[in-house]
């Protein structure tokens, strides 16, 4: 809905950006299960530049606790191994030809709790981002009302709509967090 120069769909889009960022961050958290997204942040020194691992290899999950990295260029195998070791994911690569296998070790209880704390930190950052978007929207509404571009009633109604969108987005953040927390704590 657009009133004056206020567009609530733009606020929704910005809030969804925060939830997408959260999904991406949570996807990178290592749980006890193998996931190709675990290797997304890995950067490989390839051809004189840093490249994401997915640009030099194919990542697959043949078993629940095993990642398989098929390196396309045989000369890149050592660089990919080094990048995986240097990524601080706690994975030790074993190479068979052009395939690098990564066993995902079991997580102990202490590490699980640490990961849950990290997930909570990510979720809180997403909530803060959503609240910033809400504040921007409310500030815009106040400015429009002050400049007599919208009525006070419209401003209050739109502010209520902004709050509803904010509440829904924060609820989505909480659901993402709860799902990830359950995944982490599942032994």
UniProtKB/Swiss-Prot annotation:
State the function annotated in the UniProt record: Responsible for the release of ribosomes from messenger RNA at the termination of protein biosynthesis. May increase the efficiency of translation by recycling ribosomes from one round of translation to another.
User: What protein is this chain from?
Assistant: Ribosome-recycling factor
Pfam family, any one: RRF
Q: Tell me the CDD domains matching this sequence.
A: RRF
| Localization per record | Cytoplasm
Q: Which GO terms describe its molecular function?
A: ribosomal large subunit binding
Q: Which family does it belong to?
A: Belongs to the RRF family.
Which SUPFAM superfamilies does this UniProt record tie to the protein?
A: Ribosome recycling factor, RRF
| Gene3D superfamilies xrefs | 3.30.1360.40, Ribosome-recycling factor
- Broad class of the protein's primary localization: cytoplasm
Alphabetically, which GO biological process terms does the record hold? cytoplasmic translational termination
Mention any one GO cellular component term assigned to this protein in its UniProt record.
Answer: cytosol
Keyword field? Cytoplasm, Protein biosynthesis
């Amino acid at each position: 809905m657009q009133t004056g120069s206020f567009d609530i769909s733009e606020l929704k889009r910005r809030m969804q950006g925060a939830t997408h960022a959260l999904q991406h961050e949570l996807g990178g958290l290592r749980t006890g299960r193998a996931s190709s997204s675990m290797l997304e942040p890995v950067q490989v020194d390839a051809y004189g530049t840093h490249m994401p691992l997915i640009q030099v290899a194919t990542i697959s999950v043949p078993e629940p606790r095993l990642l398989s990295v098929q390196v396309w260029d045989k000369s890149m195998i050592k660089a990919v191994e080094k990048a995986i070791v240097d990524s601080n994911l706690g994975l030790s690569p074993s190479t068979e030809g052009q395939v690098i296998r990564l066993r995902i070790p079991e997580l102990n209880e202490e590490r699980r709790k640490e990961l849950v704390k990290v997930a909570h930190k990510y979720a809180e950052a997403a909530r803060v981002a959503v609240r910033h978007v809400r504040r921007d929207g409310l500030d815009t509404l106040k400015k429009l009302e002050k400049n007599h571009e919208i009525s006070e009633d419209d401003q209050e109604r739109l502010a209520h709509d902004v709050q509803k969108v904010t509440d829904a987005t924060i609820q989505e953040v909480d659901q993402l967090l709860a799902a990830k927390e359950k995944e982490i704590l599942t032994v």
